[in-house]
Structures are given as structure tokens and as C-alpha cells.
């Protein structure tokens, strides 16, 4: 059972500020989610292999293929700022 304190604790961890209505709503919704997840414990999983993925696919790669690119002029035409060779972007790191 999820309590109001549980919701407030998780909200604090996530640095969220919730209203009273949101706390009540989240308490009910998270309680319903936990209740549903607990129903999975009642399932008969005898003979079913535990898995980490739904499909048995691991490290599926595509082959590298050389394909034609857009002309540089076309790409730069759509850029808000460029120097005829590269797209200019605002500096974000000092």
C-alpha cells in the first residue's frame, strides 16, 4: 500500500513540488500500479525461462553502407547561421 508519506518522499527525491490534490491523486494512482504489479506474483511461471528482453535479439547491427548525402549548400541554406562550411551554434560551455 502506497501512503501519502511515500508519495511525498519520492516527490522530494525527484525534486517535485506537488499540490495537495496531486499528492492524493498520485497516492491512489501509484497504489493501483503497485496492486496491479503484485498480481503478477500470482501468475504461474512454472517452466518459463527468466528473460531480460522480450525478443532474443542482442547487438543487432546493420551493415555500413555508403549513401549519398545532401549537398552542403542545401543543408547550410536551412541553417540560421553558418560560415559557408559549417553550421554555427551558440556557445553553451564557458
From Swiss-Prot:
InterPro entries: Asp/Glu-ADT_sf_sub_c, GatC
Gene3D superfamilies: Glu-tRNAGln amidotransferase C subunit, N-terminal domain
Gene Ontology process terms (BP): glutaminyl-tRNAGln biosynthesis via transamidation; regulation of translational fidelity; translation
Keyword annotations: ATP-binding, Ligase, Nucleotide-binding, Protein biosynthesis
Molecular-function annotations in GO: asparaginyl-tRNA synthase (glutamine-hydrolyzing) activity; ATP binding; glutaminyl-tRNA synthase (glutamine-hydrolyzing) activity
Record field: catalytic activity: L-glutamyl-tRNA(Gln) + L-glutamine + ATP + H2O = L-glutaminyl-tRNA(Gln) + L-glutamate + ADP + phosphate + H(+); L-aspartyl-tRNA(Asn) + L-glutamine + ATP + H2O = L-asparaginyl-tRNA(Asn) + L-glutamate + ADP + phosphate + 2 H(+)
Known EC number: 6.3.5.-
Matching SUPFAM superfamilies: Glu-tRNAGln amidotransferase C subunit
A Pfam short name: GatC
Assembly notes: Heterotrimer of A, B and C subunits.
Function: Allows the formation of correctly charged Asn-tRNA(Asn) or Gln-tRNA(Gln) through the transamidation of misacylated Asp-tRNA(Asn) or Glu-tRNA(Gln) in organisms which lack either or both of asparaginyl-tRNA or glutaminyl-tRNA synthetases. The reaction takes place in the presence of glutamine and ATP through an activated phospho-Asp-tRNA(Asn) or phospho-Glu-tRNA(Gln).
Family designation: Belongs to the GatC family.
Name of protein: Aspartyl/glutamyl-tRNA(Asn/Gln) amidotransferase subunit C
Species the sequence originates in: Caldicellulosiruptor saccharolyticus (strain ATCC 43494 / DSM 8903 / Tp8T 6331)
Amino acid at each position: 500500500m502506497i501512503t501519502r508519506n511515500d508519495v511525498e518522499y519520492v516527490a522530494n527525491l525527484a525534486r517535485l513540488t506537488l499540490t495537495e490534490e496531486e499528492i492524493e491523486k498520485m497516492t491512489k494512482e501509484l497504489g493501483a500500479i503497485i496492486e496491479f504489479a503484485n498480481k503478477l506474483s500470482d501468475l504461474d511461471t512454472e517452466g518459463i525461462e527468466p528473460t531480460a528482453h522480450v525478443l532474443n535479439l542482442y547487438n543487432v547491427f546493420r551493415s555500413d553502407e555508403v549513401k549519398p548525402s545532401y549537398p552542403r549548400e542545401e543543408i547550410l541554406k536551412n541553417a540560421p547561421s553558418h560560415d559557408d562550411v559549417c553550421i554555427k551554434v551558440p556557445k553553451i560551455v564557458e
